[in-house]
Amino acid sequence: MPITDLHCPRCGSDVKMGLPMGATVKSVTAASRQEPTSDTQKVRTVECRNDHEFFVRFEW
């Protein structure tokens, strides 16, 4: 599982997240949880070190 570097959309702090092989990040948002638009997408809730919750939608 490769590690991907993300940035918190609220404070910009670095966040590391493991994604399945071949996965591509489609969106990173703090606004609202976006549901997957296909069977090959998932949405994960992530927190940065400043306790900001945000959502990562990815596809594989």
Curated annotation (Swiss-Prot):
Disruption phenotype: Mutants show various up-regulated and down-regulated genes, including bop and crtB1. A zinc finger (C4-type) spans 8-52. Pfam families: Zn_ribbon_Brz. It comes from the Archaea. Belongs to the Brz family. NCBIfam families: Brz (NF041795). This is Transcriptional regulator Brz. It comes from Halobacterium salinarum (strain ATCC 29341 / DSM 671 / R1). The lineage of its organism: Archaea, Methanobacteriati, Methanobacteriota, Stenosarchaea group, Halobacteria. The gene is brz.
